[in-house]
């Protein structure tokens, strides 16, 4: 039998906690036998003293085991259970293509996703712009979709990692969110509860990233790879660029439109293609669906070219109660904004810098995201035809096309876009889309 205050004292004094102590504390968070004050105190001691790798693994596993852990054995699937997690960005619509692409290559992707957070868009919010799309199928239906289609994208239910929900709520109001061991455990508790064979992490770097510096993004990626492998799940991470909007669009319905166009081959933004492909390659090689990167790329290109990936996306939408002909007729189903108009720069020049975070917040301000949990989302608003770093803009080439609910909202968004995009006399050096791959 442990005492919560003794566990806090031990960590406060700089000592490592045992697996049993960590499990006792996390189970107490779940069972409400540990108070909010005690959660806050432990979070702050971890913030200042960090955690050893064994402590990090124990914390992650204890949080995972605080709820249901999915088990796929009874389905006798003929491929690996794999997933991807992104730390979030703007125009980061990779999940919508990646899930179907990997499923079309023989993987199974039980993707449990989130809503928008701060300036970053949420995969669930994007999918809910599709009429009827059900992000909370019951457990049996979820398993059926995985078995039949190969991919489902759903919301987190209360039975998955419940200790994380309470722990995070306390961290949020006590300035302990940005602690690498706590972020790692929070991300992985939910992902590892999916019962995965392999995981790839997409850790963003730059002005629209969750972590403020390259070094911190790198430290987070290394921590996640170390802990997830320590927990028995083959995991790699890619550090990818978020110094500009990743897709050509940012919003909800506008990003779903771009995802369908990507899958059908109608239009593929080159940077979005690079990042999506790199993540899919990791999933295929880690999941043993391809012997090397070259074979993985060839398989992925084939399912894009022969239409299989688009077909899987359509089947997923239909299985989750969306329209059965969504891929063919997406324009008919997706909501459109009242006012669609381009915004131009005041001077000519090359796009040299982009405050991606500010652009994400501009989408939220238009109604495309939530400022508080109770807010309703306007799925139709956002940006399309976004200028990229190095593009020459003038009276002919806009900075973006703004989809707004009215003139007032358009004016505010136009102001935000102009402030967020800096111009120069010459094009900047091009930045890589993938900076580094991290493996164990």
Curated annotation (Swiss-Prot):
Cited SUPFAM superfamilies: Nucleoside phosphorylase/phosphoribosyltransferase catalytic domain (SSF52418), Nucleoside phosphorylase/phosphoribosyltransferase N-terminal domain (SSF47648), Pyrimidine nucleoside phosphorylase C-terminal domain (SSF54680)
EC number of the protein: 2.4.2.4
PROSITE patterns: THYMID_PHOSPHORYLASE
GO cellular component terms given for this protein: cytosol
GO process annotations (BP): pyrimidine nucleobase metabolic process; thymidine metabolic process
GO molecular function terms attached to this record: 1,4-alpha-oligoglucan phosphorylase activity; thymidine phosphorylase activity
Pathway it works in: Pyrimidine metabolism; dTMP biosynthesis via salvage pathway; dTMP from thymine: step 1/2
Alphabetical UniProt keywords: Glycosyltransferase, Transferase
Reaction it catalyzes: thymidine + phosphate = 2-deoxy-alpha-D-ribose 1-phosphate + thymine
KW Glycosyltransferase (keyword) present: yes
UniProt-listed Gene3D superfamilies: Nucleoside phosphorylase/phosphoribosyltransferase catalytic domain, Pyrimidine nucleoside phosphorylase-like, C-terminal domain, Transferase, Pyrimidine Nucleoside Phosphorylase, Chain C
Record function comment: The enzymes which catalyze the reversible phosphorolysis of pyrimidine nucleosides are involved in the degradation of these compounds and in their utilization as carbon and energy sources, or in the rescue of pyrimidine bases for nucleotide synthesis.
Family stated for the protein in its record: Belongs to the thymidine/pyrimidine-nucleoside phosphorylase family.
Record-linked HAMAP family: Thymid_phosp (MF_01628)
Quaternary organization: Homodimer.
Descriptive protein name: Thymidine phosphorylase
Gene: deoA
